[in-house]
Design a protein with these regions (language model features):
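Bacterial Sec-dependent N-terminal signal peptides
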Residues: 1-22
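Mature catalytic domains of secreted/periplasmic carbohydrate-active enzymes
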Residues: 20-479
């Protein structure tokens, strides 16, 4: 009997999975809410990169919603896509969006080069848009003939990137935006798009029930083929039959359980309850720290012709602007997802690569203030000296991240510079401060400081040179 008990105990200790029943998710919100909506891995990862790349990269005009704008003869749009399309390509009766597919060759696409760029940029999770509103799947699909393996590049883009990204130790991300496909373009008779053979591309000419099934089948196919660690969904999930949405989520979570995989699903406007998924804030973040960790997706594109997909002559954000957004987002309990915009041939413009490389360079030096951190009791403050500072913490360290250099000009200053932080004081800091150090210098020397119940102040010696033109980090270590 003792031998039998010992054997059972051995299996319980050594193989705990045998003694613990796996979750079996049902397609209802109560059951789905048992899922851990925000696992610790993404709270540690903090920074990811994804890419809007698809058929819309061929016309490369206005933005990634080209399929919608080209069909809108009442378009008041700032760039007149409809009239331009007619002038360049001909009437909609003879040239449809589907005619761009053979032009979408991706002849220079290299998944390893993409993944190397993501690593160089400091990303901890990464991946492609699997399908945008236009109905063209970027993976090898049996659900729709309009996919990148059978048409266009003739390659499984999602699959190649999954392999390259995981090989480099990153979590695999992908996004699905096809919930808008059915209402995105209301196809009219007389358009080339009205040909029944294009129904699964444009969506709106399908029976609604058939389209709903296709939406679900695409989601299931992506889950089963690529097992993403995180699937991002755009807005408009209310357009999807809720039974099908819950069926998909239950399948995703159950498949993850089989693989001992901690997965995440995101949505906007709580289209998926925040007890089930992670909330995404597009190009924005809360004004203060919020309890639920969130995702902020942020595009490198900016300016008048704001676009997530590549457009000719597009303006992009600087590395400073992106890093400042990352710092703010992290200080408020968020994670930043940066979008890049590759060309139709599968290459990244040099200016985008340069920005990503500079982001990675900053994170290489100051990343300890970002990765694996959690918010401090307050996200930051504007000092009386006019400095914007954000706070994060990890272990026994608190990080004060300044968006501009609080010290003096080394070529002009004759005095030391004193910095006062009202939100850091002996009441807000739980513990005794041991030291303060300015990161990024070859020789990291302790910074003189004082602390009382009202503020912390520290002195930057006049000969101290700023270690970064982007943002400076002071590490405050507790005993």
């Amino acid at each position: 009997m003792k031998v039998l008990i010992s054997i059972v105990a051995f299996y319980v200790v050594v193989f705990p999975s045998l003694s613990q029943k796996k979750a079996d998710y049902k397609p209802d919100w109560k059951s789905l809410s048992k899922h851990t909506e925000v696992p610790e891995w993404i709270r540690d990862a903090k920074f990811g990169i994804y890419c809007h790349w698809g058929v819309y990269s061929v016309p490369a005009y206005n933005n990634e919603h080209y399929i919608q704008h080209m069909h809108n003869d009442a378009e008041y749009g700032k760039l007149g896509t409809y009239k331009r399309h007619i002038a360049l390509y001909g009437p909609l009766s003879s040239f449809g969006y589907h005619d761009f597919i053979p032009m979408f060759k991706g002849e220079k696409f290299n998944a390893d080069e993409w993944a190397d760029l993501f690593v160089k940029g400091g990303a901890k999770f990464a991946g492609p848009v699997a399908e945008h509103h236009d109905g063209f799947a970027m993976w090898e699909s049996k659900v729709t003939p309009f996919n990148a393996k059978d048409m266009g590049p003739k390659r499984d883009i999602v699959g190649e990137l999954e392999v390259a990204i995981r090989k480099r130790g990153m979590k695999f991300f992908t996004s699905l935006h096809h919930e808008l496909n059915y209402t995105n373009v209301k196809v009219k008779q007389g358009w080339a798009a009205a040909d029944p053979k294009y129904a699964k591309l444009y969506g709106s000419t399908m029976k609604h029930s058939e389209w709903q099934k296709m939406w679900l089948d695409k989601c299931i196919e992506v889950v089963d083929k690529y097992h993403p660690d995180i699937i991002y969904h755009d807005a408009w999930l209310e357009q999807v039959d809720q039974d099908k949405l819950r069926t998909y989520l239950a399948h995703y979570f159950n498949e993850a359980e089989k693989r001992n995989q901690e997965v995440i699903v995101t949505s906007k406007d709580e289209d998926i309850p925040n007890t089930v998924g992670m909330e995404d804030h597009e190009n924005s973040n809360p004004e203060k720290i919020i309890e639920k960790p969130f995702l902020c997706d942020y595009s490198i594109g900016t300016g008048f012709s704001f676009s997530w997909g590549y457009t000719e002559g597009m303006q992009i954000r600087t590395e400073k602007e992106i890093i400042h957004k990352l710092i703010e987002v992290v200080s408020k309990n968020g994670q930043l997802l940066l979008n890049l915009s590759p060309r139709a041939d599968g290459t990244f413009p040099e200016d985008q690569k340069e920005v990503v490389t500079k982001i990675g360079r900053w994170l290489w030096t100051f990343g300890e203030s970002i990765y694996e951190t959690r918010p401090f009791t307050i996200f930051g403050e504007s000092t009386s000296e006019g400095h914007q500072v954000y706070y994060t913490q990890k272990g026994k360290n608190i990080y004060a991240i300044f968006l501009n250099w609080p010290g003096g000009n080394i070529d002009k200053s004759t005095n030391d510079v004193k910095v006062n932080l009202k939100e850091l004081n002996s009441q807000s800091i739980k513990g005794k401060v041991k030291s303060i150090q300015l990161l990024g210098l070859k020789s990291i020397e302790p910074v003189p400081f004082e602390i009382n119940t009202k503020e912390m102040s520290f002195t930057i010696p006049k000969k101290t040179r700023t270690p970064s033109e982007i943002a400076q980090v002071f590490r405050i270590t507790l005993e």
